[in-house]
């Protein structure tokens, strides 16, 4: 999806690839168009009047940026793929808000050349939310995980100077487990700082 920063072209160094079970692709078009629906008066009116969504809920949708929307769509795709139902749960994160993407919102609106209305909202909603499918997903085998892990070699070892030994350590779950206590200590330090 239309993300900005290191994650848009690289496998992040802090991603436990060997513990990843699925890769789910979300198109820029889906995140951009849903962002437009969630952040325009026409889109909000459509959601309230045509989809009967609570106005208070709709007023909170701008809290979802591109990555948050993509994570929600990926969760829907995974739920469909895994045949999950109302007795199951998927937990995801909303990592950003729409306020980070106002220039992108204006570009998306401009792409519709003044033809953006409730009919377009209905088409986009149906295509990108109601019509979410399980295409462009990969359930990872061990070899797939190794292949994705190795994609990071060029970025981190050759370009960023991470030692091969440090890079390779990340293949072992013990590496990630050893960082858990450190992460908890950081959480405590952050809490202490915030209470100052």
Residue ranges with predicted function:
Residues 1-63, 104-196:
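Active-site/ligand-binding loops adjacent to catalytic centers
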């Amino acid at each position: 999806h239309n993300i900005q920063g290191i994650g848009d072209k690289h496998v992040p160094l802090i991603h436990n690839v060997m513990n990843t079970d699925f890769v789910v692709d979300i198109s820029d078009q889906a995140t951009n168009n849903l962002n437009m629906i969630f952040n325009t008066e026409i889109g909000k009116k459509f959601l309230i009047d045509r989809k009967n969504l609570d106005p208070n809920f709709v007023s909170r949708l701008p809290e979802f940026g591109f990555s948050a929307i993509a994570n929600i769509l990926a969760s829907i795709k995974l739920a469909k793929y895994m045949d999950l139902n109302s007795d199951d749960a998927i937990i995801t994160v909303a990592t950003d808000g729409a306020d980070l993407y106002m220039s992108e919102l204006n570009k998306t609106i401009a792409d519709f050349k003044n033809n953006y209305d409730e009919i377009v909202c209905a088409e986009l909603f149906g295509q990108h939310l109601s019509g979410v499918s399980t295409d462009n997903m990969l359930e990872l085998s061990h070899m797939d995980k190794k292949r994705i892990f190795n994609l990071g070699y060029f970025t981190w070892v050759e370009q960023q100077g991470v030692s091969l030994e440090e890079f390779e350590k990340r293949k072992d779950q013990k590496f990630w487990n050893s960082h858990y206590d450190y992460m908890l200590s950081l959480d405590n330090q952050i809490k202490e700082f915030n209470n100052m």
